[in-house]
Swiss-Prot record:
Cystine pairs: none
Protein family according to the UniProt entry: Belongs to the class-II pyridoxal-phosphate-dependent aminotransferase family. Histidinol-phosphate aminotransferase subfamily.
Listed CDD domains: AAT_like
Lineage: Bacteria, Bacillati, Actinomycetota, Actinomycetes, Bifidobacteriales
Record keyword Nucleus present: no
Assembly and oligomerization: Homodimer.
Name of this protein: Histidinol-phosphate aminotransferase
Amino-acid biosynthesis among keywords: yes
GO molecular function: histidinol-phosphate transaminase activity; pyridoxal phosphate binding
Catalysis: reaction(s): L-histidinol phosphate + 2-oxoglutarate = 3-(imidazol-4-yl)-2-oxopropyl phosphate + L-glutamate
Co-factor(s): pyridoxal 5'-phosphate
Species of provenance: Bifidobacterium adolescentis (strain ATCC 15703 / DSM 20083 / NCTC 11814 / E194a)
């Protein structure tokens, strides 16, 4: 993997005025020995999984002259089976929808519920793509701020709902980039507020949709609830999931949405025709045949996260212990008082370790790798912090 040069848009092209000077989103993709910056599952699919995927794709290859099932019914059935097993929540095909990664799911939600004159509300710090979805759909993006420990400030969020009258409220659990879980009681308070809240520019009786992005939810501690459990109780709740993280399927680009049928039907209006290729559907169905294997490393990654959090808390920078955000994801936000995080990033990169400069000033994020990768990260970080301290 390598980085391409930055955008150089010719002046004669009629690029939208609001896009002039913008750069494409993307974390660095570099050829380094230890890549810990994009929150992937570091373990490749088992040979049996690879074999099944290859066989299922081979089986559908003779049909590639025809369009795929645009409603991807079999895949939606597989989502249902998986979620009942993983979360104990039974959902019908009508309550599920798939797309090319949860990025496309989120974009479809913004297309359906955002637009000119509409507002979407998030809670800062949060995933950096949300404002880009808003920009791309001409939706106004507003923020409520989190507490100092990155938990949701429910009172501030509810006040923002009342003040800005959003069509969408976007929450993330575990939150990216902090890893902070969303407490069920906090989510319920937001859902209750949204039930009666007004939407700017909409007719009376229209209320906002609450979207919970659960891209990293499989890494939560055992027994921690999921927002899926509330779908039957709240008709205004939509939950986004992905196969990219815990399920070790990032290269296939498969995300999915769980919600009541009304929300799914709204998304179906804006989806592109035949948006999920036959190859994608076949590969995803094959992966679900091996759910145990695909999730086999999650418990170990959770243990690695907990051990790494404890280790980071023992480290110091300029005489102060590192701050470490509470996390139930496969990544950790740490630092808190780094006064030159860009140099720390560069020095780590020189040693073959790639992490992420993201989140509030003074913080950095590292995702969990293999045991060997994490050992190299620890060794490099200790060395780099001492070097940067010396100026």
């Amino acid at each position: 993997m390598s980085e391409t040069s930055s955008n150089a848009i010719p002046a004669y092209l009629p690029l939208r005025n609001d896009l002039i000077g913008e750069e494409p989103y993307g974390a660095p993709q570099l050829d380094v020995p230890v890549c810990l910056n994009v929150n992937e599952n570091p373990y490749a699919p088992e040979p049996a999984v690879v074999e099944t995927i290859a066989q299922r794709v081979k089986e559908i290859a003779p049909t590639l002259n025809r369009y795929p099932d645009r409603e991807h019914i079999e895949l939606r059935k597989a989502f249902s089976t998986y979620l009942e097993r993983e979360s104990g929540v039974k959902l019908s095909v009508d309550q599920l929808w798939g797309a090319n990664g949860s990025n496309e799911i989120m974009l479809q939600l913004f297309q359906a519920f955002g637009g000119p004159g509409r507002i979407a509300l998030g809670c800062d710090p949060t995933y950096s793509m949300y404002p880009e979805y808003a920009r791309d759909t001409f939706t106004t993006w507003k923020l409520a701020h989190r507490n100092a420990d990155f938990t949701l400030d429910v009172d501030a969020t509810i006040k923002a709902i009342e003040d800005v009258k959003p069509a969408m409220i976007v929450l993330t659990s575990p939150n990216n980039p902090t890893g902070t879980p969303l407490k069920p009681e906090d989510l319920k308070r937001v859902l209750e507020a949204a039930r009666t809240a007004e939407v700017a520019g909409a007719a009376e009786g229209v209320h906002p949709v609450v979207v919970v992005d659960e891209a990293y939810i499989e890494f939560r501690d055992p027994g921690t609830p999921t927002a899926l459990e509330l779908i039957g109780e709240y008709e205004n709740l939509a939950v986004s999931r992905t196969m990219s993280k815990a399920f070790a399927f990032a290269g296939a680009r498969v995300g999915y949405l769980a919600a009541n049928k009304g929300i799914i039907d709204c998304v179906r209006i804006v989806r592109m025709p035949y948006h999920l290729s036959a190859v994608t559907q076949a590969a995803a169905l094959a992966a679900f045949e091996h759910t145990d294997e695909q999730l086999s490393r999650v418990a170990h990654l959770r243990e690695t996260r907990n051990a790494t959090s404890a280790w980071l808390k023992e480290q110091t920078y300029k005489g102060q212990p590192l701050e470490v955000a509470e996390t139930q994801s496969n990544f950790i936000l740490f630092g808190g008082h780094f006064d030159d995080r860009d140099r720390i990033f560069d020095e780590l990169l020189k040693r073959g370790v790639l992490i992420r400069v993201v989140g509030p000033e003074g913080w950095m994020r590292v995702c969990m790798g293999t045991d060997e990768e994490m050992a190299r990260f620890r060794e490099a970080l200790v060395e780099v912090l001492r070097i940067v301290e010396q100026g």
